[in-house]
Amino acid sequence: MRIHLTSVLVDDQDKALHFYTEVLGFQKKTEVPLGEHRWLTVVAPEDPDGVELVLEPSDHPAVGPFRTALVTDGIPYTSFAVTNVQAETERLQALGVRFTQEPLAMGPVTTAVLDDTCGNLIMIASPVDPGPAGGAPA
């Protein structure tokens, strides 16, 4: 068994598709019309057959209170792996992305939290560089 799909709830699928592809760098994999919405997925360009992220419409009445509570408490909806959080934060800030948490080392990982403009906070994370001595002070 493996994870095939995961989703993020979005206010506007067109806006989300633009943000997740043109800003974050994912690529569109699937787009199937389903009435007023679409089955819309994106993937990492380096893993086009990997896990698909569904840009899921947030119309269900339970979604609003749930997402409001997460955002109010500063809790990310999901997390994406990056090679270097500091470099990725700088790249995204140059594109106008708003961060609610600047890069922060937390044990074995560095994280930062961004606003996806579609109603969610998203964490990016990378392993802390252990350095040449495995993390021991020089």
List the predicted regions and their residue ranges.
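Eukaryotic phosphotyrosine signaling hubs
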Residues: 3-4, 73-77
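Short beta-strand segments
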Residues: 51-53, 122
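Short, charged/polar surface micro-motifs in flexible loops or helix N-caps
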Residues: 45-50, 59-62, 85-87
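Short, P/G- and charge-enriched loop/turn segments at secondary-structure junctions
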Residues: 64-69
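Helix N-cap motif at beta-to-alpha junctions
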Residues: 12-13, 83-85
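Vicinal oxygen chelate
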Residues: 5-8, 38-41, 80, 89-138
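Core segments of cupin and vicinal oxygen chelate
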Residues: 8-51
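Short amphipathic alpha-helices within nucleic acid-binding modules
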Residues: 19, 86-91
